[in-house]
Amino acid sequence: MPIRIPDQLPAAEVLREENIFVMQESRATTQAIRPLKVIILNLMPKKIETETQFLRLLSNSPLQVDVELLRIDNRTSKNTPTEHLDTFYRQFEGIKNRNFDGLIITGAPLGLVQFEDVIYWEHLQTIMTWAKDHVTSSLYVCWAAQAGLKLLYDLPKRTRKEKLSGVYKHTNLEQHHPILRGFDDQFLAPHSHYADFSADYLNAHTDLDILATSKEAGVYLASTKDKRNVFVTGHPEYDSLTLHNEYLRDLGEGMEPIIPVNYYPDDNPDIPPKATWRSHGHLLFSNWLNYCVYQQTPYDLDHFSELNFTRD
């Protein structure tokens, strides 16, 4: 089944060119089916690029997904046209009285900024708190995972001396967990962050299920027992060239970034990289939609209740 998005969203044409099944609102309204309601809080600067990446992963599921986009505030964006934001993005005030099947909170380039110094920190806390009573399952990606751990477990920010950048091998620790269903014993996924997600630290200070780890990157995937909060510390949504573009950006800003690990052939930035994590990303999002969202959410979202959720 397709994702359902606004008719004129730029991502629609990109995804159609990739032969991804996208259904416009005008067609979807004629179908007698209850689509999943998923809202994406997009914190990344290049919002069109990011929304396209996440929509691509959400599309590879037998479930019909009705996607809405949420912005954190109404400040002018340096990287996204105001017309695009005004046309396709909701303000929190306009959706706070509604319920959703799923919420995705993207990463943000704030790895070295303390939480209290993030200009929209209080607003983000409000949205995360709201989700407890209005969203079946929330997916926190990269920086958002760190922010979610702060809100839910009061964990302070832990930062590496050097940025973690590259494609790392991860080990599947819970083969029979629904989120990991169909995963290989080991799989690759990209990382691009300063945050330090130590398995020992999370085990000592939370009751999370640690689902997948990497020797170099630490915890990659974790979940609360009821699967209502899922944390992904890397970037399974990244395109094949996203790490490359970040590397060039940092070089252009006079920084001395490391060459992303296990990314370029022969570690040569002049040779185009290949995406080695694409199938993993699609399976992760399909499992989240099915086992964390669809299997737990009420048919009538007006009947949202904590009693709907299991801790299996």
From Swiss-Prot:
List its EC numbers: 2.3.1.46
Q: In which pathway does it act?
A: Amino-acid biosynthesis; L-methionine biosynthesis via de novo pathway; O-succinyl-L-homoserine from L-homoserine: step 1/1
The catalytic activity, as recorded, is:
L-homoserine + succinyl-CoA = O-succinyl-L-homoserine + CoA
**Glycosyltransferase as UniProt keyword:** no
Q: Does the keyword ATP-binding apply?
A: no
* A GO biological-process term: L-methionine biosynthetic process from homoserine via O-succinyl-L-homoserine and cystathionine
Question: Cellular component GO terms, alphabetically?
Answer: cytoplasm
Q: Which function does this protein serve?
A: Transfers a succinyl group from succinyl-CoA to L-homoserine, forming succinyl-L-homoserine.
**NCBIfam families (UniProt xref):** metA
What is the designated name of this protein? Homoserine O-succinyltransferase
User: Which organism is this protein's natural source?
Assistant: Aliivibrio salmonicida (strain LFI1238)
